[in-house]
Amino acid sequence: MALDTLAGLAICVGLVMGVTVIASCALLVFYYCDEREDGRPSKLLQRSIRRWRHGLSTESLTAILPDGSSTEQEIYHTRL
């Protein structure tokens, strides 16, 4: 009896996860891949690509180094 309950619960969880994945993919397609009437990608997709490319080119490394003249720490940003 307990195995039947666990099997039913596992099936329900699997169905919910599957529906969630399908709904997420549908939303991504709807928001990001929706082409305008002129055949160009949507502005949201273009903006996302631009931000992704900008993020790759402007990654920064933050190091917290102690300042020798005081007890406070200064934060230095170094571009990679």
Swiss-Prot record:
Record flagged with keyword Cytoplasm: no
Taxonomic lineage of the native organism: Viruses, Duplodnaviria, Heunggongvirae, Peploviricota, Herviviricetes
Keywords: Host membrane, Membrane, Transmembrane, Transmembrane helix
Location(s) in or outside the cell: Host membrane
Organism domain of life: Viruses
Main localization (coarse): host cell
Protein name (database record): Protein UL148B
GO terms under cellular component: host cell membrane; membrane
Membrane topology category: Single-pass membrane protein
Membrane spanning stretches: 10-30
Coiled coil regions, renumbered to chain: none
UniProt keyword Translocase, yes or no: no
